[in-house]
């Protein structure tokens, strides 16, 4: 059975390559702005990932396992997604500075052969160092934070700001590897 990653994220591709030998990338065209956060962060990221997977699965013509994910940073009851602009990135990074936040990723697997849907969620706590405005501006000027939830990438320059994590490192990158591995074990595909 074919494996399809419903994401254009190079980080998700890199993570999936660790456990699945062959897969295709098909970007989801689902509009994330059609789902509003209503207080339940786990439901929110699972709903987003499920809708991404559904959109891709409807375009496929052969039996496949479609994998989709959505990752957000959550702090003080607020969802921090990708920054809209540099000012938004500055605001996000300033709020993360010296504090602990949580990163939630929802994953969804759809088996298009029998239309079974599996969703799950992972959470990782991340502790940030205290950052001054110059450090934040320099990081924003690198361009790295602009396409990442919470305006930082733990696997890149943003990793220098992380004092520690509790939970899955790959979840912070955008795809909870252990949860995904366990979910994929239920399918007849080659993993590892």
Swiss-Prot record:
Site described as Important for substrate specificity, positions? 11, 71, 155
The cellular location(s) given in this protein's UniProt record come to: Cytoplasm
Q: Offer one Pfam family short name for this entry.
A: Maf
Write out the GO MF terms. Answer: dTTP diphosphatase activity; UTP diphosphatase activity
> Which residues does UniProt assign to the signal peptide?
none
- Is the keyword Hydrolase assigned to this protein? yes
| Cellular component, GO annotation | cytoplasm
Q: InterPro entries under this entry?
A: ITPase-like_fam, Maf-like
Q: What is the catalytic activity of this protein?
A: dTTP + H2O = dTMP + diphosphate + H(+); UTP + H2O = UMP + diphosphate + H(+)
Keywords (alphabetical) are: Cytoplasm, Hydrolase, Nucleotide metabolism
- On whether Cytoplasm is a keyword of this UniProt record, the answer is yes
Q: What is its EC number?
A: 3.6.1.9
Q: What are the positions of the active site?
A: 70
Query: Which Gene Ontology BP annotations are present?
Result: nucleotide metabolic process
Q: Which cofactors?
A: a divalent metal cation
Q: Which family does it belong to?
A: Belongs to the Maf family. YhdE subfamily.
**NCBIfam families registered for this protein in UniProt:** maf (TIGR00172), PRK00078.1 (NF000867)
User: Briefly, what is this protein's role?
Assistant: Nucleoside triphosphate pyrophosphatase that hydrolyzes dTTP and UTP. May have a dual role in cell division arrest and in preventing the incorporation of modified nucleotides into cellular nucleic acids.
Q: How is this protein named in the record?
A: dTTP/UTP pyrophosphatase
Which organism encodes this protein? Answer: Clostridium perfringens (strain ATCC 13124 / DSM 756 / JCM 1290 / NCIMB 6125 / NCTC 8237 / Type A)
The opening ranks of the lineage are:
Bacteria, Bacillati, Bacillota, Clostridia, Eubacteriales
